From Swiss-Prot:
It comes from Hydrogenobaculum sp. (strain Y04AAS1). SUPFAM superfamilies: Radical SAM enzymes. Residues 142-370 form the Radical SAM core domain. This is tRNA-2-methylthio-N(6)-dimethylallyladenosine synthase. The lineage of its organism: Bacteria, Pseudomonadati, Aquificota, Aquificia, Aquificales. Catalyzes the methylthiolation of N6-(dimethylallyl)adenosine (i(6)A), leading to the formation of 2-methylthio-N6-(dimethylallyl)adenosine (ms(2)i(6)A) at position 37 in tRNAs that read codons beginning with uridine. Monomer. It holds the Pfam family TRAM.
Length: 435
């Protein structure tokens, strides 16, 4: 039997898909390279915005055609959209065999047994399952041999008014620290060099178990063989001085941080229930820059939140120009069911949102181009993750992709690279030294 998984959305979904692959392979499934060749197709969905929902509905329409050609193929839907609207999906798409949410991935073996005997398996848990941590002990099939996602917590307590995550992922639950350290040790033993800690709000890790995030960073840093540590995503209000000091002091912390600010206007931030101000966010950035040499930033921005004025938008542009992010992920606001903002009037036209996002991206393009040119003729540490043709591909400690020329096999190695060319999205360079 063969499976095919299509993953939408964030790093958490990617890691969940890696867990699902591991479960499937323990059940005797092998990976297929195409949906058409699979006995089981699973869509791991995202519902953070309206657009991912639309993509899933469209994809399900295509899969319906596939099922009409091959009635024996089994179709599954999981992830955040399934958690939010799983019963609706099952009702509208009766050809779907399997639906489960974000809180019961570990139930897959039982659900698969139901599907194998011809039953539909539809299970959406409203409450967190105390046994969900067993998922952390399941085998994981990773696409990257040298960089690995490690889930350290699930859920979010922040209750931002636009965000569906508290509904789809539940309350914050920190994973047992020893379980995390054991997984990291196992990954390093298998050849992994970079540990990427993930969660809906990793900087809130440990609040429910009296084990602060900075302490977890310190203990992971001590594990022999961990070359790099990065984490995604944090919340500015939880980016404490202790975390910043720890990041600055650990030799294997990367000097890049993704820190969403969402909007620059204090009025809009209050409506979003972000619980910080523009000044507070800029203070965190200033402290990080002062403590961590050459640190770079990326961020998320929502454009056109209800009642956003031109003056509000100018505050957002001011943050972008002040911080000088290397990368910005910007999105037009779209109301999501099960959020407080769903009941606010979406009073900005699509034309206004499109105009503002275009202006933002024009400013960001100039900033990125300027920052990328600073890499030219410098030597950067790069962890080599892939090879395409004769070119090796890796990332700098500042999270920039680099295409590398080398006469030696450097796959899976950390190398020093002399940057010869700086493009808009990547660098080109030649190996100077293998570390």
């Amino acid at each position: 039997m063969k499976y095919f998984i299509k993953t939408y959305g964030c790093q958490m979904n990617i890691n969940d898909s890696e867990k699902i692959k591991g479960i499937l392979q323990t059940q005797g499934y092998e990976p297929a390279t195409r949906e058409e060749d699979a006995d089981l197709v699973i869509l791991n969905t995202c519902t953070i915005r309206e657009k991912p929902d639309q993509k899933v509905w469209s994809h399900l329409g295509e899969i319906k055609k596939l099922k009409s050609i091959n009635p024996n193929i089994k179709i599954g839907v999981c992830g955040c959209m399934a958690q939010r609207a799983g019963y609706e999906i099952a009702s509208k798409m009766p050809f779907i065999d399997l639906v489960f949410g974000t809180k019961n991935i570990h139930h897959m073996p039982k659900l698969l047994e139901d599907v194998k005997v011809g039953n539909r398996a539809i299970e959406i848990l409203e409450e967190e399952d105390p046994s969900e941590n067993i998922l952390d002990s399941y085998p994981t099939v990773r696409d990257n041999s040298y960089c690995a996602y490690v889930t350290i917590m699930r859920g979010c307590d922040k209750e931002c008014t636009y965000c569906v995550v508290p509904f789809t992922r539940g309350k914050e639950r920190s994973r047992n620290p020893q379980s995390i350290l054991d997984e990291v040790k196992s990954l390093v033993d298998s050849g992994v060099m970079e540990i990427h800690l993930i969660g809906q709000n990793v900087t809130a890790y440990g609040k429910d178990i009296d084990y602060p995030f900075y302490k977890l960073l310190e203990n992971i840093s001590k594990i022999e063989g961990v070359k790099r540590i990065r984490f995604t995503t944090g919340h500015p209000i939880d980016m404490t001085d202790d975390i910043i000091e720890t990041m600055a002091n650990l030799p294997n912390m990367v000097n890049h941080l993704h820190l969403p600010f969402q909007a620059g206007s204090d009025r809009i931030l209050e409506l979003m229930k972000r619980n910080y101000t523009k000044a507070y966010y800029l203070n965190r950035i200033e402290k990080l820059k002062a403590k961590i040499k050459d640190i770079t930033f990326s961020t998320d921005i929502i454009i056109g939140f209800p009642t956003e004025t031109e003056e509000d938008f100018q505050h957002t542009l001011d943050v972008v120009q002040t911080v000088e992010f290397e990368q910005v992920f910007s999105f037009k606001y779209s109301k999501r069911p099960n959020t407080p903002a769903y009941y606010m009037e979406d009073d900005l036209t699509d034309e206004i949102k499109t105009d503002r996002i275009k202006r933002l991206l024009e400013i960001q393009k100039a900033i990125t181009s300027k920052l990328m040119q600073r890499y030219k003729n410098t030597v950067q540490k790069v962890l080599v993750e892939d090879k395409k043709g004769n070119t090796y591909i890796g990332r700098t400690t500042t999270n920039v992709w680099c295409n590398i020329t080398s006469s030696q096999d450097i796959l899976g190695k950390e190398v020093e690279v002399l940057i010869a060319k700086a493009g808009f999205q990547s660098l080109d360079g030649v190996v100077q030294n293998i570390l």
